[in-house]
Amino acid sequence: MPTINVNKVDLERLCNLVLSDKLIEDKFPMMGVEVEEIFEEIDKSGKKQKIIQFSINPDRPDYLSVEGLARGFRGFMGINTGFQQFDVYESDTNVTVLDNESRPYIAFALVKNVQMDEMVLESIINLQEKLHWALGRDRKKLAIGVHDFDMVKGPFTYKEIKGDEIKFAPLGYDSEEMTPKEILEKHEKGQKYGKLIKDGKFPIIVDSKNNVLSMPPIINGTLTKVTKNSKNLLIDITGTEKEAVEEALNIFVCSLFERSGTIYSVNVNGKRYPDLTPRYREISIDLINKKLGLELNAGEIISALKKARMDVKFENEKLMVKIPAYRNDILHNVDLKEEVAKNHGYEKFEGKLPSIATTGSRNPIEKKCKHYQNTMLGFGFFEVMNLTLSNQETLFEKMNLKYSEKDYVEVLKPASIEHRVLRTSILPMLLETLFINKHNVLPQKIFEIGDCVLIDENDTKTDTKCKNIKKISCAVVHPLTNFNEIKTVTEGLLRETFGEFEIENYEHPSFISGRCAKILNNGKEIGFFGEIHPEVILNFELEHPIVAFEILIE
């Protein structure tokens, strides 16, 4: 989980409270924020400052700043409750977006009259970097630029240019101008994030005088560097996913609002950002009480939700909940139930022992999986663990497989384009793992045991019409690997587990024709193995022969 270091003095002034160490250690965990440690450090002026390190759950990116933590804590403690209104005024600032294939989405906001000092400046920089990590996947999905608005003049333009088309002084090189290409070669950030620049096209943001504000996702220009004397801030967020870009902007401007900033919208190709329109969800009192095992009345539930900085209307035993724009984690009514539990007080829940006695034992399927695991480890393989979430390109297109929407379960609101569907096979994930480790020495022998999810229209037991199946898959890569090697491994595993099995010739689009076989157990097909097709190897940007198997466990 990400951690943030917060100056205690800064937290106290934002909370408008004097906070003892005991209060911090007792109360913050109750609102879902763990206190890692409290320590002292020397600041730039030589004074001792007390620092609190918090551990933040990944589903609460609004807590990645001291401003967000203070807002949440004021609500939790009952100091400021209910929906916090964020007024957004229209500015005359305009941005023109020209074709930009590599990072097509961009959003802007203007926040004026921010009460800036060293602590505020440090908080802005920290939030920027934490959001890069938490929402931006290390700038791949989104990148944030913060600028001194008074140093430039609109309108602004976001476009792609060639590597030698313009020169500007990047942050850290105040007096040395470079081309975008030179920045990738010489600048620390260019060397680190240059891989995100595709096809030699460099995204750039310029003002009306062609001054460079930013070259996302690499570096800002030194012209708009934010200092403790800056008060009017222009925020740009570029990325590959529209929803993530807008969510990050909402979190950022709401944090600056806590510093007495006034939020102004910016016109980006005819659309105004930020959009802080609240969302609404309806939930019943009975549903909340049933889930929590409590008997709360409407007033108690409304009070708890108001502590979560939401507003609630009560009609016909139903609650209409008004959710702030920065709460991108509220995706389902179960999230509202969690907010009620948290703000009602976890300490008020009473544990009850069940009235029956049971004896625990390992699940039979897990015992079987453990046997598979031990066998593969004995064969000299390394075990890996991948996510169950994947995407159509990895599961089907790179594997040379045809597919339709009936072949996979799709995620309704995916957090990223890489995680849009539930995997139907483990083998593509192993090939991705080999790609990530292609710089390591060969041979590489890996396996994974895990769940795959398939659509089952005949399922009458659940509403989802889906079923989880357990599979094992392995892959071997080195210059001399061949069908005989994977056949030996597969037969060895099958003798240890299934006992009786048959092997027949098999044609599979992911494997070389004539070098693939299917596995039968009591006449039922349970898996396949063979040499991976060269096209598939190239699709995953790998360079050596690969053999693999995939077997159904249950």
From Swiss-Prot:
Positions that bind Mg(2+): D329, D335, E338, E339
Superkingdom of source: Archaea
PROSITE patterns: B5 (PS51483)
E.C. number(s) listed in UniProt: 6.1.1.20
Keywords: Aminoacyl-tRNA synthetase, ATP-binding, Cytoplasm, Ligase, Magnesium, Metal-binding, Nucleotide-binding, Protein biosynthesis
InterPro entries: aa-tRNA-synth_II/BPL/LPL, B3/B4_tRNA-bd, DNA-bd_dom_put_sf, Phe-tRNA-ligase_IIc_bsu, Phe-tRNA-synth_IIc_bsu_arc_euk, Phe-tRNA_synthase-like_B3/B4, Phe_tRNA_ligase_beta2_arc, PheRS_beta_core
Database matches in CDD domains: PheRS_beta_core
Pfam families referenced in this protein's UniProt entry, alphabetically: B3_4, B5, PhetRS_B1, tRNA_synthFbeta
Cellular compartments annotated: Cytoplasm
Entry cofactors: Mg(2+)
UniProt feature coiled coil, ranges: none
Alphabetical GO biological process terms: phenylalanyl-tRNA aminoacylation
Any one annotated GO CC term: phenylalanine-tRNA ligase complex
Gene Ontology molecular functions: ATP binding; magnesium ion binding; phenylalanine-tRNA ligase activity; RNA binding
NCBIfam families: pheT_arch
UniProt family annotation: Belongs to the phenylalanyl-tRNA synthetase beta subunit family. Type 2 subfamily.
Subunit text: Tetramer of two alpha and two beta subunits.
Name listed for the protein in its UniProt record: Phenylalanine--tRNA ligase beta subunit
Organism: Methanococcus vannielii (strain ATCC 35089 / DSM 1224 / JCM 13029 / OCM 148 / SB)
Gene transcribed to yield this protein: pheT
